[in-house]
UniProtKB/Swiss-Prot annotation, chain B:
Ranges that cross the membrane: 30-50, 91-111, 128-148, 193-213, 214-234
InterPro entries: ATP_syn_F0_a_bact/chloroplast, ATP_synth_F0_asu, ATP_synth_F0_asu_AS, F0_ATP_A_sf
Official protein name in the record: ATP synthase subunit a
Source organism phylogeny: Bacteria, Bacillati, Cyanobacteriota, Cyanophyceae, Synechococcales
Pfam families attached to this UniProt entry: ATP-synt_A
SUPFAM superfamilies linked: F1F0 ATP synthase subunit A
């Protein structure tokens, strides 16, 4: 009796296939359309809109970040060039002042040398003059002595 | 003796009894439609409540529904592929929701308390008609998907790596709906029977872990059914090179 009920008697049974099948199929197809318009479409719209929003924002942020990085690199190179420029100017000024110092030193040295030379020449000429005079006086004196000696004799 | 009492208990479970509705010449299993209408009604109410006020910052029910949508999309996308999953997502999702709601509704709601003149209320998926209907819809879908996407080239699939595959691939077209329908039917019916028998034999405590196991199987079966349906459709639309 039980086995009869279990495996499909004419009336009832587990494997009793009838018009329930096509009607259930129609019901599921209808449910698909209903759920599509009630659930899948609206929720999908909201979720996809949000996903688009988020991905757009991420792209925008990435662009901004890369722009910032580019600007940073720009600034860095600018800073670098400014630094080298400053260094160049400083070294130029140092060279300049060095040159000026050397020139002034040379000039002063030359001047000192010249005046030293002049003084030496003057000293020499005066020495010579003095010597000349001295020798002349000696000559005079000797002549006088000679003359006096000659006269006394 | 024991066997006899077991048999009477089985008989008390009213296995294979149906509440017949006669409309003209056709006969329907009324209990299947009654439970499915109640469960689908609840599902639709739940969904319309959740989608009533959609916001960009999801709250409450909308959050849950979005999670569900995302879950179904992932399922469809991984099985069917990026190109056509959008067309089939509602169908796969409906299969998943229908099977899931039917299984869980059948297991969670104490239908036994409602007395019918004949048969008893239970999971709509524990009726072979429902599962065969679902499985045939899946078969139609993958044929339609293959033919609409690839035209007559769809039949290249039957001789795909070699023509030797032809008989096996044709056989597959029959075994697919068969295995789909009987897997779901068998699992859900077996779960109902096990719980029913245990409740009769030991009404306290012991059936509870089995009931939890039943809920687990029910969810897994819904996932398996939807995944396989999506996989068959994906197989049909896949391009061979």
């Amino acid at each position: 009796m039980l086995a009869f009920n279990f495996f499909g008697a004419t009336e009832g049974g587990l494997f009793d296939i009838n018009a329930t099948l096509p009607l259930m199929a129609i019901q599921v197809v209808a449910l698909t359309y209903i759920l599509n318009s009630l659930f899948f479409k609206p929720v999908g719209n909201v979720v996809e809109k949000r996903e688009k929003f988020v991905s757009n924002n991420i792209i925008e942020a990435k662009n901004k970040l890369s722009e910032v990085k580019k600007l940073e690199a720009d600034l860095l190179t600018q800073l670098q060039s400014a630094r080298t420029e400053a260094q160049r100017i400083v070294s130029e000024a140092e060279n300049e002042s060095d040159k000026l110092y050397k020139e002034a030193l040379d000039l002063a040295n030359n001047e000192a040398n010249a005046s030293k030379e002049k003084a030496r020449l003057e000293i020499e000429s005066q020495t010579n003059a003095a010597r000349d005079q001295l020798s002349k006086q000696a000559d005079d004196l000797s002549e006088l002595i000679v003359n006096r000696l000659i006269l006394e004799k | 003796m024991f066997f006899n009492s077991l048999l009477t208990n089985f008989a008390a479970l009213e296995v294979g009894q149906h509440l017949y509705w006669q409309i003209g010449n056709i006969r329907l299993h009324g209990q299947v439609f009654l439970t499915s209408w109640i469960l689908l009604g609840a599902l639709l109410v739940f969904i319309s409540l959740g989608t009533k006020k959609m916001e960009n910052d999801p709250k409450g029910l909308q959050n849950l529904l979005e999670f569900l949508w995302d879950y179904i999309r992932d399922l469809a996308r991984t099985q069917i592929g990026e190109k056509v999953y959008r067309d089939w997502m509602p169908f796969i999702g409906t299969l998943f929701l229908f099977v899931f709601v039917s299984n869980w509704g059948g297991a969670l709601i104490p239908w036994r308390l409602i007395k019918l003149p004949s048969g008893e209320l239970g999971a709509p998926t524990a009726d072979i008609n429902t599962t065969i209907a679902l499985a045939l819809l899946v078969s139609l879908s993958y044929f339609y998907a293959g033919l609409s996407n690839k035209g007559w080239r769809y039949f290249e699939y039957y001789v795909h790596p070699t023509p030797i595959m032809l008989p096996f691939k044709i056989l597959e077209d029959f075994t697919k709906p068969l295995s789909l329908s009987f897997r779901l039917f068998g699992n859900i019916l077996a779960d109902e029977l096990v719980v029913g028998v245990l409740v009769f034999l030991v009404p306290l405590i012991l059936p509870i872990p089995v009931m939890f196991l039943g809920l687990f199987t029910s969810a897994i079966q819904a996932l398996i059914f939807a995944t396989l349906a999506a996989y068959y459709i994906g197989e049909a639309v896949e391009e061979h090179h």
